[in-house]
Amino acid sequence: MTRLYISGPVTGIENDNIQAFEDARRKLRRYYMVDIPHEYVYAGAPHEEAMAILLHQLTDRTYSYRKGKRANLYEGVALLPGWEQSEGARLERAVAEACGIPCKTVDEWLEEAR
């Protein structure tokens, strides 16, 4: 099953926008394994620390028995609405694409799976 990382705006949004991330995860879980950044970064972490943790997580490579080689932990990034205005989400997208990880909106991933 494809594993996705959800990226979107967090900083400056009430409760770190966790409701939007949880809503997206709930929709995507029908078709994908899904992680959200809130699982890896503690509430109130400085932005620089959060980004270091999340970029490390996003670019992690592990041995894939299915593929018989080391592969990206995530096979895709699902972008929440508003990602374009988020410095962190834009950086996550750029890094993911540089690592060959496809990035699409949540709706695009859902449409592809149906």
In which residue ranges do the predicted regions lie?
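Conserved catalytic or regulatory cores that recognize and/or transform ribose-phosphate-containing ligands
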Residues: M1-R114
